[in-house]
Amino acid sequence: MKLEAENDLMAVRLEKLHQLQEAGIEPYGGPFEVTHSTTAIRERFDELEGQEVALAGRLLAIRSHGKASFADLQDREGRLQLYIRLDNVGPGIYELFQKLDIGDIVGVRGKVFRTHRGEISVEVRQLTLLCKSLRPLPEKWHGLKDVDLRYRQRYLDLIVNPEVKQVFITRARIIRAIRSFLDNRGFLEVETPTMHPIAGGAAARPFITHHNALDIDLYLRIALELHLKRLLVGGLEKVYEMGRIFRNEGISTKHNPEFTMLELYQAYADYYVMMDLLEEMVAYVAREALGTTVVTYQGDRLDLTPPWPRLTMLEAIKKYYGVDFDQLPTAEDARRAAISLGLEIEPGMERGKIINEVFEATVEPHLIQPTFILDYPVAISPLAKRKKENPDFTYRFEAFIAGRELANAFSELNDPIDQRRRFEAQMAERAAGDEEAHMMDEDFLQALEYGMPPAGGMGIGIDRLVMVLTDSPSIRDVILFPTMRPKEE
């Protein structure tokens, strides 16, 4: 019934389109010179009252009253009321206006005034049809409520839900602020390949494509890391890249197969430098994008002001779970502790992996305020440098906000012999069925053998940062066109 009603409305609009064309009116016009936005007219009303302005946008409401009518026009910044009188525009333009529908795009010229009810408006003197809309907007001006439809047809979401548009405006401010922060600190923005002969830099399942001319399979990148480290070898001491990453994995409120990652690397630094850099950058970005370092996310008040608390992984487990893994030196000891928590631990799992399983189950949900978790097990950190005092752990941290990982950073492993051993261990896990284990990357190892300076490196999930700063519960709310299951016919 809904589809039939929509088809009926489209038929009416098509008939209006034909009438306009027969009358010699172009329904899909050309350029229109805009002098002011709706926001500028509101903010500068005292200056503009009585002055002629030109603005363009989409009609979201039409109220006809005989020889005078009102309409609401929405442009990129907001809405403004239009007032159209037959006496002002003449019968030709007024007849055109009466053939318009909600959703049509128009350009108008007229004088700024305030109605008797106090509404800032434009008294239209000229009107140009710029685009005839053939489909009716959903639920008129009451908003698009179907969440699935919002994601599939984001253009409609942006039209009828102004708060959604604001999320993506804020996202652009966040990305601009990140670039400004890094550029001002001497980092060089670079671009590295999206298609890789070997998938590496993260534990993830890649997408595979085929290059016809070379007749080889290639992988869409799952990380930026290994190419950026090659640039450290080449002498570019402070580099960053912000780009799309592709991981052939599940979809959830926290995960989209295609997402935006920032990775940066600084020669002669370590993970302590990366901690300082991250907390300074997040606070800077929040101030630039929002004007504050205190935000609310899903009811929680988050203070992004540095310094952030720092705990080792073992300290965090002891704090939130009450178990001291320093007193559980063997994998079997760790396994029993994990099983007592109700976790399913595979036979033969390494102690470091068990510790991480316990951490994810017992600690992560508690990390609401910005927190650094330091010193991850070497078993899950194949690209991070080992701690000298405890080689079972690495100089690696993850930063958490609102119970979710925001960033991952290392003191980078630059020992090519140790790196080869790590890759060999990963290959053994891959042979045992772990599809997310690292592949052997001989070209990267060769680069390390020329010598890479000690460095700190970091990866930051841009979408998750935007989620926090815009109070968005799902990653789909901050990606313009998220990945969706094909629509059933």
From Swiss-Prot:
It is an enzyme of class 6 (ligase). Keywords: Aminoacyl-tRNA synthetase, ATP-binding, Cytoplasm, Ligase, Magnesium, Metal-binding, Nucleotide-binding, Protein biosynthesis. SUPFAM superfamilies: Class II aaRS and biotin synthetases, Nucleic acid-binding proteins. InterPro entries: Aa-tRNA-synt_II, aa-tRNA-synth_II, aa-tRNA-synth_II/BPL/LPL, Lys-tRNA-ligase_II, Lys-tRNA-ligase_II_bac/euk, Lys-tRNA-ligase_II_N, Lys-tRNA-synth_II_C, NA-bd_OB-fold. GO terms for cellular component: cytosol. Mg(2+) 1 binds at E398, E405. Its cofactor is Mg(2+). PROSITE patterns: AA_TRNA_LIGASE_II. Its EC number is 6.1.1.6. The keyword ATP-binding applies. It holds the Pfam family tRNA-synt_2. One of its GO terms (biological process) is lysyl-tRNA aminoacylation. Binds 3 Mg(2+) ions per subunit. One of its GO terms (molecular function) is transferase activity. It catalyses: tRNA(Lys) + L-lysine + ATP = L-lysyl-tRNA(Lys) + AMP + diphosphate. Mg(2+) 2 binds at E405. It comes from the Bacteria. Its main location: cytoplasm. It is found in: Cytoplasm. Belongs to the class-II aminoacyl-tRNA synthetase family. HAMAP family: Lys_tRNA_synth_class2. Homodimer. This is Lysine--tRNA ligase. It comes from Moorella thermoacetica (strain ATCC 39073 / JCM 9320).
